[in-house]
Amino acid sequence: MAVSSAFVVTPKLEKLLANHHNPTYSSSPAPLDVIGIRALPMNNRNKRGLIQRARCEISPSNKAASISALEQLKTSAIDRYTKERSSIVVIGLSIHTAPVEMREKLAIPEAEWPRAIAELCGLNHIEEAAVLSTCNRMEIYVLALSQHRGVKEVTEWMSKTSGIPVSEICQHRFLLYNKDVTQHIFEVSAGLDSLVLGEGQILAQVKQVVKVGQGVNGFGRNISGLFKHAITVGKRVRTETNIAAGAVSVSSAAVELALMKLPESSHASSARMLVVGAGKMGKLVIKHLVAKGCTKMVVVNRSEEKVAAVRNEMPPGVEIIYKPLDEMLSCAAEADVVFTSTASETPLFLKEQVETLPPVRDARLFVDISVPRNVGSCVAEIDGTRVFNVDDLKEVVAANKEDRVRKAMDAQAIITDESKHFEAWRDSLETVPTIKKLRGYTERIIAAEIEKSLPKMGIDMNKKMRKTVDDLIRGIVNKLLHGPMQHLRCDGNDSRTLSETLDNMQALNRMYGLDAEILEEKIRAKVEKK
């Protein structure tokens, strides 16, 4: 968008321009001497800003040309922030890009999501944010004023909260922008990006992001709209492609893996099973064990309530024995297979504890599907002990994947269609600031003209007469604005109409100098937030 050269550079905007030309930023503009202004070093003692100092360097002989160049500089700097809208960005690490050792350090418990959103939105170039943290992925979704600076700030925030160096995060992270973000979250919600293709639990986790985000300031219109649309896509894909039919879940894959690793002389009905944790994942482990023929197992949990609820869902003949958490180690001493799926942020089984357990006939199996992990990595060093985590489930998943590849192709067609709808909706939001600013612009003119005209009328007008004059002026202005306003409204469904609407918006921004106001409002919001 072009910006009128007549706009006034206010202190906040001047500060932004000064920062924008600070050499510490990697996205620095072209050298100022190219346009006839000598670049001067920035320092904290001089608060008058780049533009003030540049103005002092204008020689009398080149004054006119330099002023023109200065206006170009102002305009180009503003353009950098207003020509393109804020970007939706995802900075993520998943089972496809990072090991569980890293993911568990970055994991953010659900109860901490609102705090994380608030901290992310406190960063200079972040307007909105959401966190999707599961056993297979840790992804930060943001609306960023600047792609490069937004990514830099979020990556540094991730490093600070996890203790992982920025360089290491950069080696394993993936970055996606705008349309690619839309494609990605839709694939995630549909189960296409899961280790277990088509699994349904991820859709519930995406729903939880929206549920937790409701009422959180930083979970704004763009990001919330993205996640809500992702839920719609996830439901549609599962309904129209039946991709979840026959799909294994992480829990069922864990059970399959355990049975694969049991010695030939053992099977589900004879092996002694222990399940630690009776949450969603633990409940599914129990159900899959029963489906495989296991009729007796011990379940360790903080409270008996959840275990009793699971027990009531089991068929006759299945014995589920509840044990409190403080008896976990003694229960493990009598188990051949230990499944762990709790929300604990520290390991429940450490090497020094497991070393004290009596040996079993072949090897004691620990199948840990928690992130952060419930079983310390050093436990695998103990003789007669084998440890598996979520990254080891790929062996099971590979055998189950082929028959759903075709359904995944059908799902991609749905995702492509829904992505177009979402991007069109987001494009239609672009005109909202212009509509608000144009309305505010006319309101200021109306108020100023009424105040200026009333004394000239030479009469003391009562409230009723004043309201009549006010309504008359507003009626005239509203009729004049009706046409422009109609040409700024679009639902985003028709690409041709949308393109025309955006052209109209840019024209009005140029005519009334609204770009600078819109930018200053963003800056003001950031300053007030801090």
Curated annotation (Swiss-Prot):
Q: Which CDD domains match?
A: NAD_bind_Glutamyl_tRNA_reduct
- Expressed in which tissues: Expressed in roots and flowers. Detected in leaves, hypocotyls and cotyledons.
Example GO molecular function term? Answer: glutamyl-tRNA reductase activity
Q: Which pairs are disulfide-linked?
A: none
**Transit peptide per record:** 1-64
**Major localisation:** plastid
| Any Gene Ontology CC annotation | chloroplast
Query: Catalysed reaction per UniProt?
Result: (S)-4-amino-5-oxopentanoate + tRNA(Glu) + NADP(+) = L-glutamyl-tRNA(Glu) + NADPH + H(+)
Stated induction or repression of this protein's expression = Not regulated by light. Up-regulated locally by wounding and reactive oxygen species. Not regulated by methyl jasmonate.
Signal peptide extent: none
Q: Which InterPro entries match?
A: 4pyrrol_synth_GluRdtase (IPR000343), 4pyrrol_synth_GluRdtase_dimer (IPR015896), 4pyrrol_synth_GluRdtase_N (IPR015895), GluRdtase_CS (IPR018214), GluRdtase_dimer_dom_sf (IPR036453), GluRdtase_N_sf (IPR036343), NAD(P)-bd_dom_sf (IPR036291), Shikm_DH/Glu-tRNA_Rdtase (IPR006151)
Q: Which GO terms describe its biological process?
A: chlorophyll biosynthetic process; heme biosynthetic process; protoporphyrinogen IX biosynthetic process; response to oxidative stress; tetrapyrrole biosynthetic process
Q: Where does the record say this protein resides? A: Plastid, Chloroplast
User: What does UniProt list as catalytic?
Assistant: C135 (nucleophile)
Which EC number(s) does the record attach to this protein? Answer: 1.2.1.70
Q: Which residues bind substrate?
A: T134, C135, N136, R137, S194, E199, G200, Q201, Q205
Instruction: Report residues binding NADP(+).
Output: G277, A278, G279, K280, M281, G282
Miscellaneous field: During catalysis, the active site Cys acts as a nucleophile attacking the alpha-carbonyl group of tRNA-bound glutamate with the formation of a thioester intermediate between enzyme and glutamate, and the concomitant release of tRNA(Glu). The thioester intermediate is finally reduced by direct hydride transfer from NADPH, to form the product GSA.
Protein purpose: Catalyzes the NADPH-dependent reduction of glutamyl-tRNA(Glu) to glutamate 1-semialdehyde (GSA). Probably involved in wound-induced supply of heme to defensive hemoproteins outside plastids.
The protein's name: Glutamyl-tRNA reductase 2, chloroplastic
| Originating organism | Arabidopsis thaliana (Mouse-ear cress)
